[in-house]
């Protein structure tokens, strides 16, 4: 039996700016379950929904890595790997190889992708300290520094 569920408010780019960031169960790369809501409301958060095979994500990577260093201790960065043609092990090897120092999670069931109405990989959501979405963007050419500033 299918149960209808209300979807969060969204625009063509996913969730609408101004809405409260939802939680969703994902897992760490070593298999522990974690809810995205555990990152929300404790300070600004940048969520990136990405994949190893995503060329736009690869284009965003240097910008994300620079911001992770620049805003260390001020902004939490969370990379949410989608499960399409991926595995936690492959994602872990990639994150290690490229020196990721921020949180990397795996969306095993697609719960986070659904909760955030992710239109495609390279989708970035910036959430302010109060848990409100202040930016959403898609593609390899995003002005992430300005987006992070909106979350501070």
How should each PLM-predicted stretch be described?
Residues 58-98, 108-115, 146:
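Structural microenvironment flanking redox-active thiols in thiol-disulfide oxidoreductases
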Residues 46-47, 77, 124:
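Hydrophobic beta-strand anchors of alpha/beta hydrolase catalytic cores
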Residues 41-42, 93-101, 108-151:
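Thiol/disulfide oxidoreductase modules built on the thioredoxin-like
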Residues 36-55:
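Short active-site neighborhood of thiol/selenol oxidoreductases, capturing the structured segment around
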Residues 1-5:
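Bacterial N-terminal signal peptides
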Residues 7-37:
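N-terminal "domain-start" segment that seeds a small globular fold
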């Amino acid at each position: 039996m299918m149960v209808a569920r209300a979807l969060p408010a969204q625009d063509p780019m996913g969730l609408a700016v101004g809405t409260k960031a939802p939680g969703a169960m994902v897992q760490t790369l070593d298999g522990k379950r974690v809810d995205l809501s555990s990152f929300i409301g404790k300070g600004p958060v940048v969520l990136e929904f990405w994949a190893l095979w995503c060329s736009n994500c690869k284009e965003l990577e240097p910008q994300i890595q620079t911001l992770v260093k620049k805003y260390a201790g001020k902004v939490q960065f969370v990379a949410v790997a989608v499960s399409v043609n991926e595995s936690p092990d492959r994602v872990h090897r990639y994150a290690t190889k490229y020196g990721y120092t921020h949180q990397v999670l795996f969306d095993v069931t697609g719960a986070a992708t659904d909760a955030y109405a992710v239109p495609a990989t390279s989708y970035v959501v910036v959430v302010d300290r109060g848990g409100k979405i202040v930016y959403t963007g898609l593609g390899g050419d995003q002005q992430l520094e300005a987006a992070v500033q909106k979350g501070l």
